[in-house]
Amino acid sequence: MYCPFCRHPDSRVVDSRVTDDGTAIRRRRSCPECGRRFTTVETAALSVIKRSGVIEPFSRAKVIAGVRKACQGRPVSEDALALLAQRVEDELRATGCSEVTSQEVGLAVLGPLRELDDVAYLRFASVYRGFESLEDFEAEIALQRAERALERSETVERGRPVPSRGVDDR
């Protein structure tokens, strides 16, 4: 790493820390030539390949803006939107790929958004999946109801004690 003061081609790492949100590493460095200290912030690049083929850096702000439109008029806080965007970025980075498609970004948004707000999920899914008719909405609502019923039944089953096989239960 070049020293920004004397342009010496080497530096020594004095301290390394992960930033608060965990997306970058902050390093304190020292130049062996001039002795001055400086800080660098290192992040792994995450790029999004859009449908048009254009590649641009991943932007949490864009995720938040898109989800905010779906949440308009809904009781969803800015903190919840920021947390959702963080979860989306974490999921995309966990793939280990430096480039993801806009389709993958949309898919990564759907899960956390469904947990956050059903109506916002339906709004986002309608744009993301290109709903063209009432039947598309009805099919998605039916799917959500079926999944919700399945989740409830699994919760009830886990909550009930398993009957013992005693002498009288044969």
Curated annotation (Swiss-Prot):
GO molecular function term, any single one: ATP binding
Chain spans, region Disordered: 151-170
Domain ATP-cone: residue ranges: 46-136
InterPro entries per the UniProt record, alphabetical: ATP-cone_dom, NrdR-like_N, RNR_NrdR-like
Top-level taxon of the source organism: Bacteria
Cofactor(s) required for function per UniProt: Zn(2+)
Family listed: Belongs to the NrdR family.
Cofactor binding: number and manner: Binds 1 zinc ion.
HAMAP family to which the protein is assigned, alphabetical: NrdR
Gene, per the UniProt record: nrdR
TM annotation in the entry: none
Zinc finger (unnamed): 3-34
Protein name: Transcriptional repressor NrdR
Function: Negatively regulates transcription of bacterial ribonucleotide reductase nrd genes and operons by binding to NrdR-boxes.
